[in-house]
Amino acid sequence: RMRRTLAMVEAFRADDGETPLILMGYYNPIFSYGVGAFVADARAAGVDGLIVVDLPPEEDEELRPVAREAGLDFVRMATPTTDDKRIARVLDGASGFIYYVSITGITGTRSAAIAAVTEAVERLRRHTDLPIAVGFGIKTPEQAAAVVSAADAVVVGSALVQKIFDGLDDSGAARAGLVEAVLGFAGSLAEGVHGARRDARAP
């Protein structure tokens, strides 16, 4: 599956060399692939950075230095339970941006509390100049717009996956209009973000 993922990156890069691509997943597939081989192949395919969700700072020494030496950003994650002492450890060695997990629990199952997210982002900004992206629990253009008023970026994953799932028939094949539905939803999220930024710049 990792090779298929990297092949998808290569195919994307054939048409788009500008959009940043961050791979997000778990460490075991990287370990099984071989850290050095994975980093080299990911970089060659056109990957820009990594988010390894189950690899805390204390356990990333096999991967992070190799990734950074190859020019891949190593994005770290902060959560609502990350206190000021822990933040320092999370930020040490992080690059690219910080991914703030807006809710605890499993992604896609709850809605982010915008006020709490704003407070958390402000706290993170006191510790780092890295951009801050917020994800987990963001499902609508309105939520995305509200979050980006405080953060630098919004990450939407589960809502897009659900949109794809809703467009499959009982055999798992895509129904007519699935691609258009997914693109339309992604466009509405983007417009929510862009609209919020336009409003913020307005006099």
Task: Please give the residue ranges for each predicted region.
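Glycine-rich phosphate-binding active-site loops on the catalytic face of alpha/beta enzymes
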Residues: 45-51, 56, 100-108, 137, ...
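Hydrophobic faces of well-ordered beta-strands that scaffold small-molecule active sites
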Residues: 21-25, 50-52, 74-78, 98-100, ...
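Active-site-adjacent beta->alpha loops and helix N-cap segments on the catalytic face
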Residues: 1-12, 30-36, 52-69, 83-89, ...
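Histidine/lysine/aspartate-rich catalytic loop segments that bind and position anionic ligands
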Residues: 72-110
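Catalytic cores of alpha/beta
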Residues: 82-92, 127, 134, 138-154
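Glycine-enriched alpha-helix->loop->beta-strand junction motifs that scaffold or abut catalytic
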Residues: 42-48, 66-75, 92-99, 150-154
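Alpha-helix-loop-beta-strand connector modules within alpha/beta enzyme cores
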Residues: 1-22, 65-79, 115-132, 180-200
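Hydrophobic alpha-helical segments and helix pairs
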Residues: 16-51
